[in-house]
Amino acid sequence: MKLHVAALATLAVVCILAAGSEAAPKAMSDPAVVKAQLFPDAFWESFKNVSMEFKKMVHGLQTSNIGEHAKSLYTDTVAVLTPYLQKIRENVTKMYQVYVESKQH
């Protein structure tokens, strides 16, 4: 049960990030906006925590004895989410670069 809750929570975060990632390039075009409010240090700490929890969940699924049906569902879910995760990773990388540049000025 705990594993299912973690999977659903992670899926919710992925969906939220995917929805926000479409608007991210527009926001990044104005460095003043980035500096002012979009990416405080707490945002990046939270993002690191979510990423770490996702990695733990994936490792747990890969190493657990959950049965072939559940592993098949997991594999199918990862196949569907991978393109979205790659787009999110690209956009978050861009946002982080802008964030780092804003800290240097």
From Swiss-Prot:
Tissues where this protein is expressed: Plasma.
Span of the signal peptide: 1-21
Keywords: HDL, Lipid transport, Secreted, Signal, Transport
Propeptide: 22-29
Parts forming coiled coils: none
Primary localization: secreted
Localization, UniProt: Secreted
GO biological process, one term: lipid transport
Gene3D superfamilies: Apolipoprotein (1.20.120.20)
Any single Gene Ontology cellular-component annotation: high-density lipoprotein particle
Protein origin, superkingdom: Eukaryota
Protein name: Blood plasma apolipoprotein LAL1
